Amino acid sequence: MLSRIAIATVFLLFFARSAANAADRDHLQRGEEKLTADFEIKHDRAIRHVLSRGWRQDVVVRMVDIPAFEAESVAGIARTANGYTAFETAAPGNLWYELGLGSDDPKRKKDYRRIKPRLHERSLSEALAARIAALWRRVLTDPRNYWKDPALYMDTNQFTYHVSFLPHERLTAYVDGWGPHSEQLIWVGRAMANHAKGAPEKDLIKAVKKAEAKLGI
């Protein structure tokens, strides 16, 4: 989770970097990012509290999206007693700014426990849930997708992917930006979110088929 301290100076670089984000290779890092700075830990704590739906024990597929300027969100799949559910939970605004984490002004400090998220959920077939989980598995188990990126980006989204669909399966990775393979997960993750909000199922199926073709499934 990257510092926003210098956001003002990098804002003008956003559009130039965005065009280059879809790099020629992925730079996934295994597990979840190890946070050390106090402001990073506070931001992460707020995200996990406000968007707590994304970390419930029934979640078997997850994509956490932490943008530099827009609202944080989590899209995923939950395995419930009634079957599978696609969901999206999103903050009402960028929590970094909502909570005044980058400000020394005490008047801007807010209690994240009072912030209410937006939440959408919708049933999903087991077959489609399994296909989506297979996409996450393909990307997260391919060692070629793990590579240390020497650059430091403060103007792009950070994504964390997780899948625990199969017995004893627990795969997690994070990345700043995206590459040709993790980009497919972004498109499917956003299609899942749209499905949860009522978009036609065919749109999600189309996104899954396209990702399967790109990833060779």
What are these regions (language model features)?
Residues I5-L13:
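Sec-dependent N-terminal signal peptides
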Residues A22-I217:
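Function-determining sites in protein domains
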Residues M1-L2:
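N-terminal secretory signal peptides that target proteins for export/translocation
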Residues L13-N21:
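C-terminal segment of classical bacterial N-terminal signal peptides
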